[in-house]
Regions:
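Short amphipathic helical patch at the helix-1/turn junction of helix-turn-helix
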Residues: 69, 103-104
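Conserved catalytic-core motifs of GNAT/GCN5-like acyltransferases
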Residues: 101, 119-135
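Conserved catalytic core of the tyrosine transesterase superfamily
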Residues: 97, 103, 133, 138-140, ...
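Short glycine/proline-centered loop/turn elements that form peptide/ligand docking sites
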Residues: 83, 105-109, 126-131
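Conserved GNAT acetyl-CoA-binding A-motif
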Residues: 90-101, 124
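Short secondary-structure junctions
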Residues: 3-5, 119-120
Length: 150
């Protein structure tokens, strides 16, 4: 199974995945998810095994807005597959770099991002509601026609 593009019609299902994957103070509602998908340049993917990713492109840059995998579906490559799908989609829209924020203590996510070419380029102090810092990471995107898989 591979990640499939999402539409606002899937917002409730995406919100359920997000709610199961994140702490209550970090959960996005179906309304917020719909708004992000509907933004100019907004897009996302859902994996039927229990994962979702939302991103957006602006001119020649892309940003991962959120990536969530159900706890029972982790360590099966879903996060990697979703991230690769978003990187490919962004590259097809002429984005040449992708950015994201990740909690400094989220070691599993940081390893995933590093495995796909992301490197730390900054820090947002006290970014999260609990006061934790976010690391800003960046990856160069592969031009269309070339494979981003690592």
């Amino acid at each position: 199974m591979s990640p499939q593009p999402v539409t606002t019609a899937l917002a409730e299902a995406l919100a359920a995945i997000h709610a199961a994957a994140f702490a209550p103070d970090e959960v996005w509602s179906a309304t917020v998810i719909s708004l992000h998908i509907g933004l100019p340049g907004g897009f996302g993917f859902m994996d039927p095994r229990g994962g979702m990713i939302l991103a957006r492109t602006i001119v020649d840059e892309a940003e991962i807005l959120t990536l969530a995998v159900l706890p029972e579906a982790r360590h099966q490559g879903l996060g990697r597959d979703l991230l690769r799908a978003a990187m490919r989609k962004a590259a097809k829209t002429d984005a040449r770099a992708m950015f994201l924020e990740v909690a400094e203590d989220n070691i599993a996510a940081r390893r995933l991002y590093a495995s796909q070419g992301f490197t730390e380029v900054g820090r947002r102090k006290r970014y999260y509601a609990n006061g934790d810092d976010a690391l800003v990471m960046r990856a160069a995107l592969t031009p269309p026609g070339e494979d981003v898989a690592r």
